[in-house]
Amino acid sequence: MAGNNKRNCEVYLFGETSTMESGHKTVKPKGIRPVYKTAGAAAADLAVPERVEIKPHETVKICLNIGFEIPKGYCVKLYPRSSLLVKRGLIQPVSIIDQDYSGQKVHAPLHNLTDSVVVLEAGERVCQAMLEPYFDVVDWDHEQNERDPAGFGGSGRV
């Protein structure tokens, strides 16, 4: 996920070869490298490596055949592309890939909201990946805070 002025994150592209009982070899397509489509893009687009059919109202977990080597103190978040719902009727929840999941295959969960089969062709972009820092939870003595615990307007009148 290298890009202009962006924190780097190594990407693995997986491909699989397996032999069936008949002796025929099958090859699972290699993952497609994430791409920043514009110079100002905050997230890299991720694509499906092979054709996928999603039945009406079905939820699927699509293996993208990629993995990330995530730096310490960071995680990768998968966000839906805005066109996924508007143009295809698919939703994808925000997903978090923890630093200690580095090197594992990434999957994108998708749900078909429509009454029709939705077909995603190989190479079709379905979500976006963003490398983000995360915070650690620490103990804090809230009694030392001078602000009013009421919330809005808690620091006093303007």
Place the predicted regions along the sequence by residue.
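DUTPase catalytic domain/fold
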Residues: 1-158
